[in-house]
Amino acid sequence: MNNVEKKIKKIISKILNIKVEKILNNASFLDDLSADSLDIVELIMAIEEEFDIEISDEDAEKLNTVQKSIDYINNKNKK
């Protein structure tokens, strides 16, 4: 598990009150982790703050799984 993955899973764990070990990379925030729309907004804001980036609304809509969020941050960090 790389640093980005650890940080994102820690954020998810805190906001959704789920143990980090139970968060799978292919998990959907809505379907698998039972997040609602407010949780998603909170997750996006926490990720933006943690990684000091801004995520557009268009991009935020695409970040619907743990892995997509990890990939997004990894790609942002490469730029």
Swiss-Prot record:
It comes from Buchnera aphidicola subsp. Schizaphis graminum (strain Sg). Carrier of the growing fatty acid chain in fatty acid biosynthesis. The modification O-(pantetheine 4'-phosphoryl)serine is found at residue 37. 4'-phosphopantetheine is transferred from CoA to a specific serine of apo-ACP by AcpS. This modification is essential for activity because fatty acids are bound in thioester linkage to the sulfhydryl of the prosthetic group. Pfam families: PP-binding. Its main location: cytoplasm. GO terms for cellular component: cytoplasm. The keyword S-adenosyl-L-methionine does not apply. Keywords: Cytoplasm, Fatty acid biosynthesis, Fatty acid metabolism, Lipid biosynthesis, Lipid metabolism, Phosphopantetheine, Phosphoprotein. Belongs to the acyl carrier protein (ACP) family. InterPro entries: ACP (IPR003231), ACP-like_sf (IPR036736), PP-bd_ACP (IPR009081). HAMAP family: Acyl_carrier (MF_01217). The keyword Hydrolase does not apply. Pathway: Lipid metabolism; fatty acid biosynthesis. Residues 1-77 form the Carrier domain. One of its GO terms (molecular function) is acyl binding. SUPFAM superfamilies: ACP-like (SSF47336). It is found in: Cytoplasm. This is Acyl carrier protein.
